[in-house]
Amino acid sequence: MVPTMIYSAILALSAFTPSVLAQTRSSGCGKQPSLTNGVHNINGREYILKVPDNYDKNKAHHLVFGLHWRGGNMWNIVDGQSVQPWYGLETRAQGSTIFVAPNGKNAGWANNGGEDIAFIDAIIKQVEGDLCVDQSSRFATGFSWGGGMSYSLACSRAKQFRAVSVLSGGVISGCDGGNDPIAYLGIHGINDGVLPFQGGVNLAQKFVKNNRCQQANVGTPQPGSHGSVRTDFKGCSKPVSFIAYDGGHDAAPLGVGSSLAPDATWKFFMAA
């Protein structure tokens, strides 16, 4: 009788314990939103918001942060010149996603004293308090210093973000914490002369360890092939993948018109 009672109690408790992967709707769900597309300000710092044209206040949306590179700004993420708009993710999202492009301080993400992490925390609070977001479906991506900031989020906000995609990043925005698992995609050019290729591999290896993946060598393409090689690590608690491509320090790997990074990032996010 006692084991049966214990089992029943466990079942009852489980009904009130949400799964880690279960959708958690933000407080903005069901509200008539006041935030609109365009530039918004939090304590003197700006970000660009892009809400889907067919926004439904009762539908929980993905939330994606697009982070700019050193010397860039939030407008570079949306103008479609150095990269496809929103790193090519908006067209793939097909109305399922709210996008945010924060503006770095002094055209970068030094994250002194964690100020850039705090800024992103504040954006999340503002956006999710007004719009309907699936809080288990937050993502970040960026190139160069934006990649470094995405890596920093993976380190310190692994429990708040579902996955990151780091394009040619480095440890340049810090790594506070850095012990929790998170789905991690790295994309890096084998001839990167700014943030070396091996450094990008090392970033991924941190999450190979955190996610308890089996160790494996990262594959690389032949120089001059204009190709790429993807390594998917095995046995991970959360997925870790790394794409090495034949190129340098490129905001858009293999060119602005290439689907390599946008396709890989979007599919990785949705499968994480």
UniProtKB/Swiss-Prot annotation:
Alphabetical keyword list: Carbohydrate metabolism, Hydrolase, Polysaccharide degradation, Secreted, Serine esterase, Signal, Xylan degradation
UniProt xrefs under SUPFAM superfamilies: alpha/beta-Hydrolases
Compartment list: Secreted
EC class name: hydrolase
GO CC terms, sorted: extracellular region
Catalyzed reaction equations: feruloyl-polysaccharide + H2O = ferulate + polysaccharide
Domain of life: Eukaryota
Function: Involved in degradation of plant cell walls. Hydrolyzes the feruloyl-arabinose ester bond in arabinoxylans, and the feruloyl-galactose ester bond in pectin. Active against paranitrophenyl-acetate, methyl ferulate and wheat arabinoxylan.
Family indicated by similarity: Belongs to the faeC family.
Protein name (Swiss-Prot/TrEMBL): Probable feruloyl esterase C
